[in-house]
From Swiss-Prot:
Record carries keyword Lipid biosynthesis: yes
Residues recorded as bearing O-(pantetheine 4'-phosphoryl)serine in the entry: S37
Protein name per Swiss-Prot or TrEMBL: Acyl carrier protein
Keywords of this entry: Cytoplasm, Fatty acid biosynthesis, Fatty acid metabolism, Lipid biosynthesis, Lipid metabolism, Phosphopantetheine, Phosphoprotein
Gene from which the chain derives: acpP
Superkingdom, natural source: Bacteria
Amino acid sequence: MAEVLEKVTKIIVDRLGVEESKVTLEASFKEDLGADSLDVVELVMELEDEFGVEISDGDAENINTVGDAVKYIEANA
């Protein structure tokens, strides 16, 4: 989990320009990290590329926090 979290954190920091300390498993992309809908779509696409997974639109709608993303990747990568 730590390796996946590290990669996800780096992508979020690079994409959203937030401080690494704000990226926690409980952090909401929109509410805590200031992402808008387009940011979330771009994050999902980048996660797909980085981890070689395909995240359906339905699944993407359920990925609201950093922890959700990490759990999804671990279960599907």
